[in-house]
């Protein structure tokens, strides 16, 4: 057979193989979608079976014996005998495991590792024990995401996903168990490293780049490979919105080096990891002067609006979490993406993976997550945002099963996991938005107890976010917007006051700062007062009663919040899970922020307050 005929036959064979895999993928999609329907139709029955299975497999655990379960696996005994707990309640057991005690403390199955919290959940890294087969449950939930997405966005098997994914170097507990973020655990697992080919889940980033603990080398390689494959990219994403913005910032800083590598067909000497160099060499197979010139032309314009769709023109959506605290980044992502849809696909934490968004292309403000009943046993603690906090020694409110959730009510999620956490308060506040079959759907409201407080006032993350958004509208006429913010309750003044740190971005052609310096100061002072007007009645009452001082805005120079993130990562935070803290109290972070302040502004008057209005 002639060489050309051989090549054609090989190409045809490969095409047939790909087509066959695509057909198989469609069949798997149908099976996965039916699985979702089956689980959600029989939600409460599945929950009862899951609880019985958890209690049966852990009936030899010291924790369940201590609380008198005595091998019982029924829901009634469990609720009557096992208490609702927080991390502090479980700390003694967790420390025993971390220090090397291998007895069946909370689980009859061996604890294989600890999953660390992000480092920004109430300011504390927590160690969450997990077991080997938990990876199977996480993988199962991941396997449901694309079948749902394919209902809304066709043709995703015809291209690739540009995802910026990272790990961090893990630590060991005194007893020798790994302690690492949940995504680091997953990316380093065989489930991820040896995943079978799936035409709907092809990444531009080499696995070697994702698994590199050096953040610069990892980002550089992932960005370079993403640029080389620009025509094939159909979706762009990261775990959190902040991670995707960090990638755009990286492109702004390093596009010249990236273009040089593309032009010469060589990889920068700054990337020294051999496995990355080998992987990138396969992607960067030959010089591409045309692509290099394109990168230089687009990035050299200093016009970054719509840069994502300019660099990756076939992108159909952004795959990022933009709920909760990440909602802050929606305007900036719209700016850089040219208004692409943003898909929030799943809801998970270090403690447990919970569920998925069955309408992933909905507006970010409408995102609701459907809880999958096979992931763990879930209960709800009623939460009244207007009620005074309970005393620490007060019994918690009576919990309700998810099947009995009321639409419109807010609840705190309480979980029981296969790894041995029993009736554990996660700290997430959720609002019931409806049901899919018998499964409740929730909007993520906020993390509990992320507060500013000077006197009797308590301002949570959602209130602070709303106040910042209201004040930022005053900057819009000048082409300025808030890139990032955080806050602190400054008790060094008498009375104490709220301090809010803003980092600004000015769009091309914007009129900021105003020509008159005095006008600029006036705008910021109005922003201070606008924020105060948006805060709750207790705060405004305190201001009028001089129990709280005027709110202060401190404007910081560009890049400050990247420095804050770099500092957090240097202290062990995960680059994947990092979220800029909305309230800070850690001295070195406050010192860093204050050292970058370029101007300070105070509210010029007290906000309106009436005891008869909220």
From Swiss-Prot:
Expressed in roots, flowers and callus. Induction: By auxin. GO terms for cellular component: cytoplasm. GO terms for molecular function: acid-amino acid ligase activity. Belongs to the IAA-amido conjugating enzyme family. May catalyze the synthesis of indole-3-acetic acid (IAA)-amino acid conjugates, providing a mechanism for the plant to cope with the presence of excess auxin. This is Probable indole-3-acetic acid-amido synthetase GH3.2. It comes from Oryza sativa subsp. japonica (Rice).
């Amino acid at each position: 057979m002639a060489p050309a005929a051989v090549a054609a036959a090989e190409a045809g064979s490969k095409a047939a193989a790909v087509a066959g895999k695509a057909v198989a993928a469609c069949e798997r999609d149908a099976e996965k979608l039916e699985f979702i329907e089956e689980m959600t139709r029989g939600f409460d029955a599945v929950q009862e079976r899951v609880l019985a299975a958890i209690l049966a497999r852990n009936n030899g655990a010291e924790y369940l014996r201590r609380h008198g379960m005595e091998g019982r696996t029924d829901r009634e005994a469990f609720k009557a005998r096992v208490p609702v707990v927080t991390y502090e309640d479980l700390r003694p057991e967790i420390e025993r495991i971390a220090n090397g005690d291998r007895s069946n403390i909370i689980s009859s199955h061996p604890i294989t590792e600890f999953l660390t919290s992000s480092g920004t959940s109430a300011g504390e890294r927590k160690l969450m024990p997990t077991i080997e087969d938990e990876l199977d449950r996480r993988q199962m939930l991941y396997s449901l995401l694309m079948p749902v997405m394919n209902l809304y966005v066709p043709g995703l098997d015809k291209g690739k996903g540009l995802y910026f994914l990272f790990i961090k170097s893990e630590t060991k507990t005194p007893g020798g168990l790994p302690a690492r973020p949940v995504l680091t655990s997953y990316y380093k697992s065989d489930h991820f490293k040896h995943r079978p080919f799936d035409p709907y889940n092809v990444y531009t980033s080499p696995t070697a780049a994702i698994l590199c603990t050096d953040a610069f080398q990892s980002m550089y390689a992932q960005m370079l490979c993403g640029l080389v494959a620009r025509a094939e990219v159909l979706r762009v994403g990261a775990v959190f919105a902040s991670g995707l913005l960090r990638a755009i910032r990286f492109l702004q800083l390093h596009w010249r080096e990236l273009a040089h590598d593309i032009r010469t067909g060589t990889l920068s000497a700054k990337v020294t990891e051999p496995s990355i160099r080998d992987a990138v060499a396969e992607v960067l197979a030959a010089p591409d002067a045309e692509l290099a010139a394109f990168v230089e032309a687009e990035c050299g314009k200093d016009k970054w609006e719509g840069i994502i769709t300019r660099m990756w023109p076939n992108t159909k959506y952004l795959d990022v979490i933009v709920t909760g605290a990440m909602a802050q980044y929606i305007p900036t992502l719209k700016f850089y993406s040219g208004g692409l849809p943003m898909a929030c696909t799943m809801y998970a934490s270090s403690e447990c993976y919970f569920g998925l968004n069955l309408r992933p292309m909905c507006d970010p403000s409408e995102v609701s997550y459907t809880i999958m009943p096979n992931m763990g046993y879930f209960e709800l603690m009623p939460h009244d945002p207007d009620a005074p906090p309970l005393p620490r020694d007060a019994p918690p409110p009576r919990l309700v099963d998810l099947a009995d959730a009321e639409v419109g009510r807010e609840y705190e999620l309480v979980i029981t996991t296969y790894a041995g956490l029993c009736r554990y308060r996660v700290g997430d506040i959720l609002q019931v938005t409806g049901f899919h079959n018998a499964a409740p759907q929730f909007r993520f409201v906020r993390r509990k107890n992320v507060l500013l407080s000077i006197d009797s006032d308590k301002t949570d993350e959602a209130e602070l976010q709303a106040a910042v958004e209201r004040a930022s509208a005053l900057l819009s006429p000048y082409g300025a917007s808030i890139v990032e913010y955080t806050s602190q309750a400054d008790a060094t003044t008498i009375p104490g006051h709220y301090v809010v740190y803003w980092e600004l971005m000015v769009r091309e052609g914007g009129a900021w700062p105003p020509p008159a310096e005095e006008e600029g100061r006036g705008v910021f002072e109005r922003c201070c007062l606008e924020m105060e007007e948006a805060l709750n009645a207790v705060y405004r009452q305190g201001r009028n009663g001089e129990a709280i001082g005027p709110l202060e805005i401190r404007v910081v120079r560009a890049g400050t919040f990247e420095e804050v993130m770099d500092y957090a990562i240097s202290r062990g935070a995960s680059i994947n899970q990092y979220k800029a803290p909305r309230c800070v109290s850690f001295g070195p972070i406050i010192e860093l922020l204050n050292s970058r302040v370029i101007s300070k502004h105070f509210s010029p008057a007290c906000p309106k307050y009436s005891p008869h209005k909220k």
